[in-house]
């Protein structure tokens, strides 16, 4: 949604046609089912006329990084924001160098970044998609849902009232 708010062409990947349809309803221009197309970078290159994309938001991690690199253009940027496929694997460094690409590990950010993000969300009217919320006591169930990959959007954790507040 944020990418669409700044007039970007958005290509999303998912293992689920239902999730791809939901992403399209939220503004995604193209959807690729990576189970049907394990070498999904080929579809990205087809969509972009062989050029590749400027930016990849990589949530899969090691298991999908090579496809993300092959989807990005020469000089493209890959923002690694998740590691759903595992913590470590081989990075094809020669391919990375030949493509002159950059990979950045992106964390949650500091307070200033969060404030800027909230302002951007408010300015664009984007509404974050929250699949489900769990009480803190059900944290294990939230992690199981995330691991199963059945959610669409964010999984929230309700910590309860802030200390000193009355509910």
Question: Could you tell me what each predicted segment is?
Answer:
Residues 1-37:
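Mid-domain Rossmann-like dinucleotide-binding core that forms the NAD(H)/NADP(H) cofactor-binding site
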Residues 74-81, 90-132:
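Rossmann-fold dehydrogenase core element
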Residues 63-73:
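Rossmann-fold NAD(P) dinucleotide-binding segment
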Residues 38-50:
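Short amphipathic alpha-helix with an adjacent loop that forms part of the alpha/beta core around
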Residues 36, 60-61, 82-83:
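Short glycine-/small-residue-rich Rossmann-like dinucleotide-binding loops
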Residues 14-22, 87-93, 113-115:
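Short, glycine/polar-rich helix-capping loops at beta-to-alpha or helix-loop-helix junctions
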Residues 54-57:
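N-terminal Rossmann-like NAD(P) cofactor-binding module of classical short-chain dehydrogenase/reductase
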Residues 66, 111-167:
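C-terminal hydrophobic helical "lid"/dimerization subdomain
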């Amino acid at each position: 949604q944020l990418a669409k708010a700044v007039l970007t062409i958005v290509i999303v990947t998912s293992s689920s046609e239902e999730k791809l349809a939901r992403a399209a309803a939220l503004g995604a221009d193209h959807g690729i089912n990576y189970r049907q197309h394990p070498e999904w970078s080929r579809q990205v290159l087809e969509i972009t006329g062989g050029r590749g994309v400027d930016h990849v938001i990589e949530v899969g991690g090691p298991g999908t990084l090579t496809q993300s690199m092959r989807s990005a253009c020469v000089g493209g940027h890959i923002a690694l924001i998740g590691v759903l496929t595992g913590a470590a694997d081989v990075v094809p460094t020669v391919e990375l160098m030949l493509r002159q690409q950059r990979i950045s590990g992106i964390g949650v950010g500091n307070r200033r970044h969060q404030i800027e993000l909230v302002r951007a969300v408010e300015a664009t009217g984007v509404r974050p998609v929250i699949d489900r919320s769990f009480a803190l006591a059900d944290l294990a169930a939230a992690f199981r849902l995330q691991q199963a990959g059945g959610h669409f959007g964010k999984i929230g954790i309700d910590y309860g009232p802030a200390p000193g507040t009355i509910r």
